[in-house]
Amino acid sequence: TETETTSFSIPKTDQPSSPKFVSGQPNLIFQGNAYSTDGKLILTEAKQNTVGRALYSAPIHIWDRKTGKVADFTASFTFYIRPNSDSQVVADGFTFFIAPVDTQPRGDGGLLGVFNREEYDPTIHTVAVEFDTFHNQPWDPDYIHIGVDINSIKSRITRPWNPHYDTYSIAYIAYKAATNELDVTVTYPNSRDYATLREVVDLKQIVPEWVRVGLSASTATYYSAHEVYSWSFHSELGGTSSSN
C-alpha cells in the first residue's frame, strides 16, 4: 500500500498572498467559543469561563493496526495571547491536541478545553501539547510552562516557558514514529528566546487509528484572548508492513 499523507496550511505556505483565516473557515470544525474572522482564528475572547476549539475537519489516519505503522507528523502555528487590559494576570493557555474523531470540548480554565480532571483517564485517548500561562493547583508546576499531556491535564513533562505578550509566538511540533519522539519548540520573531522539550510518546497505546487534530484555549476567573494567525500540519503514514 502507498504512503498516506494529510496536509493543510492556512494560509497556504506556497501562496503567501492566499487568504488567511476567513469567516467560517471551510476546512475547520469550530467548538465552544471559537470562530474565525478577518485573518485570524479566535479560540477565546478576553472573557471569563470560556473554551474554544478548532479541529481540522478531515479525520487523520495516525496509525495502522494491520501494518503496525505509525505516522510521522509536523505541526506549526503562530499564536498571540492578548492579555486582559484590566488585569496583569494571563490565563489559561493553548493546546495542540490529538483526539478521537468525535472529540468534544471539556473543562475550561486550567483544563484547557481538552481534559475534565487531573486523574489519568485512558478512555479519552488524547495527547495534548500545552502552552500554559497560569499556575493551576494542584497539578501544574509553579512556573509558566510548555508540557505534554497524555490522558490527563497533569503533564508528563514540563519545561519553563517565558511567553512574550507583546508579539506573536511560533510553535513547532514534530513527531518521529521510529523513535516515538515528540519535539516541541516555541520561538518569537526578533528574539533569541525559546522554549523546547522532547518526550517519548507511544501514540499506538494512546489514541485510536483515526483521529482529529485541533487547537484549543480556555479561560476561567482570569482570562486572555487567544488568537491564531496561521496553522499548518503534515502527516505521513507508511504503507509497508512492519513484519517485512
From Swiss-Prot:
UniProt GO MF annotations: carbohydrate binding
PROSITE patterns reported in the protein's UniProt record: LECTIN_LEGUME_ALPHA, LECTIN_LEGUME_BETA
InterPro entries: ConA-like_dom_sf, L-lectin, Lectin_LegA_CS, Lectin_legB_Mn/Ca_BS, Legume_lectin_dom, Leguminous_Lectin
The keyword Transferase is assigned to this record: no
SUPFAM superfamilies: Concanavalin A-like lectins/glucanases
Keyword field: Lectin
Presence of the UniProt keyword Aminoacyl-tRNA synthetase in the record: no
Family the entry assigns: Belongs to the leguminous lectin family.
Protein name as annotated: Lectin
